[in-house]
């Protein structure tokens, strides 16, 4: 806003854009840690420009201020947390060889990076039934935790069970912890 009454506005340039690379970066989140600004956003494989591809997942960037030159995390890949292209087929196979099969089995999306590095996601399909068809999940995915340091992130494998916490493990009523505790917590 250009005034305190918030009746005049000015458009500012985007914090990050993927022109000619990716036409969709969504759910941007700013995370502050150790004097750095971390910008996380999500994207999808099918939103990359022709001839380019990347995994569905969380992409992260680090800068010295809100309006700084953000640099991609993890050796300039930007990938902070990604899904395999398709868990149903071996690498190198077509993306979706059978249009009746969900290419998203066991895959999560719509990630949200929270303070402390916890990541909530949504999951569509959670494996297959006895016929091998995906079972609809339609729910929050298991929580994971990212370790964030400098220009690097990694999945915290000590969180939960080998890096996977409980479904919707959001410790909003307790101090930040290592997490992964799926027992009910009493509100204080």
What do the predicted segments below correspond to?
Residues 1-188:
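Carbohydrate-active catalytic/glycan-binding domains of CAZyme proteins
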């Amino acid at each position: 806003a250009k005034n305190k009454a918030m009746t005049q506005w000015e458009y500012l340039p985007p914090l990050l854009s993927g022109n000619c690379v990716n036409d969709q970066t969504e759910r941007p989140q700013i995370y502050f840690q150790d004097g750095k600004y971390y910008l996380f956003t999500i994207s999808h494989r099918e939103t990359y420009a022709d001839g380019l591809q990347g995994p569905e997942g969380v992409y992260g960037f680090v800068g010295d201020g809100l309006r700084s030159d953000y640099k991609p995390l993890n050796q300039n890949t930007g990938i902070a947390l990604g899904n395999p292209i398709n868990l149903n087929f071996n690498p190198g196979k077509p993306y979706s060889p059978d249009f009746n099969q969900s290419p998203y089995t066991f895959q999560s999306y719509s990630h949200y990076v929270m303070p402390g590095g916890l990541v909530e996601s949504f999951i569509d399909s959670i494996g297959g039934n006895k016929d091998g068809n995906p079972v609809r999940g339609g729910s929050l995915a298991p929580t994971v935790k990212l370790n964030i340091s400098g220009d690097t992130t990694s999945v915290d494998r000590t969180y939960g069970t080998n890096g996977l916490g409980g479904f919707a493990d959001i410790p909003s009523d307790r101090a930040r912890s290592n997490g992964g505790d799926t027992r009910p917590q009493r509100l204080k």
